[in-house]
Amino acid sequence: MIEIKNLTKFYGKGESCFKALDDVSVCINDGEFVVILGASGSGKSTFLNVISGLETIDGGSVVYDSEQLENMSEKELTIFRRDNTAYIFQQYYLLPHLTVEKNIKMGADLDNNKDFFPLIEAVGLSEKRKKFPSELSGGEQQRVAIARALAKNPKVLFLDEPTGALDENTGRLVLDYIIKLQEKQRFTMIMVTHNANIAETADRVIKMNSGKIVGITENTDKKTVYEIGW
């Protein structure tokens, strides 16, 4: 379980100080798929970055089971993120000198004996697995980043608009694969999106505005990506 209590985040100093997160509290259960909705500037991406340990906590706490992020040293936090989490953000951060296949293997804790072909095939890159990032389109590079994160078999997967660079059909296929994998492996998945339709596939939906949680909805009738359309 991830327990978030009275979480606060500031940007800037003095008169330019801005409260991006304002006393946010929520618990996220193990194996749960949570979608975070909100307009631009609502604090949803900041919330994701802080609870994932990518940004510092200015007030409150984030507790994974019994481990508090705010009490960890930089080294401890790096090890914790490496061993427990994976990220799919809008930036790709691919290694330009490695092929598609090797970039994906980089996410798997050096377990290079594992068969990654089913994963590569699922994101539609089987014919380009020997290509380099410079030979791929932006959407194809995003699919490599998605596969690399999934190759880690994370306990918690964080996603920030993961299919934003993909065309509608490819985005639907990739997202459907991610959701089905989450349901099978039961890792915790927390996704920021502007797409209210995608929220219908989640266990819970958190709505944010002005750095605060303004609503939490449970989905009693979860749908698949193919059922909802985009």
Predicted regions and their residues:
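Conserved beta-strand-loop-alpha-helix hinge in the C-terminal portion
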Residues: 212-230
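ABC family nucleotide-binding domain
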Residues: 2-202, 207-208
